[in-house]
């Protein structure tokens, strides 16, 4: 049976394999590149906002942030108004590789959209956003029963 989930999973697996290959020398894997890019494009973002933007759980975000920090690509600065929160920034090392990571991302987006009209891409994105919203609505019905 055909389903959005099956095709989404295949796209995810194939793209992750390409990302892993292209970013191997930087020691940034498919599990971290999206976190890296969001931080690069939104320096000062909080860890919570980072996870929210990527639709991932707190523990997943924490692991990715810790990995990128350990590799020297990002740093965390405590928020003055509330010491419980940290803002995330690229380090000099992170800034040095940022263009390369963004280039790989752009290259893979080009592969995704090869021979597909822009109008179809935009429509597909709108459909996928609706699917995500539907899933979030369903998840909210079970507040407290999912791990976040």
PLM regions: where:
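Residues within helix-turn-helix
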Residues: 47-48, 59, 66, 86
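C-terminal regulatory/oligomerization modules of transcriptional regulators
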Residues: 119-148
């Amino acid at each position: 049976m055909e389903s959005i989930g099956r095709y989404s999973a295949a796209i995810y697996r194939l793209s992750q394999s390409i990302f892993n290959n292209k970013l191997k020398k930087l020691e940034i894997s498919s599990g971290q590149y999206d976190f890296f890019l969001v931080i690069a494009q939104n320096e000062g973002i909080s860890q919570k906002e980072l996870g929210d933007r990527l639709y991932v759980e707190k523990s997943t975000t924490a692991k990715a942030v810790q990995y990128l920090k350990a590799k020297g690509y990002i740093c965390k600065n405590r928020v003055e108004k509330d010491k419980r929160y940290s803002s995330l920034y690229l380090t000099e090392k992170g800034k040095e590789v940022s263009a390369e990571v963004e280039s790989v991302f752009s290259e893979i987006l080009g592969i995704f959209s090869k021979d597909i009209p822009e109008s179809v891409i935009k429509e597909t994105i709108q459909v996928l956003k609706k699917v995500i919203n539907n899933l979030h609505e369903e998840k909210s019905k079970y507040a407290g029963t999912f791990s976040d």
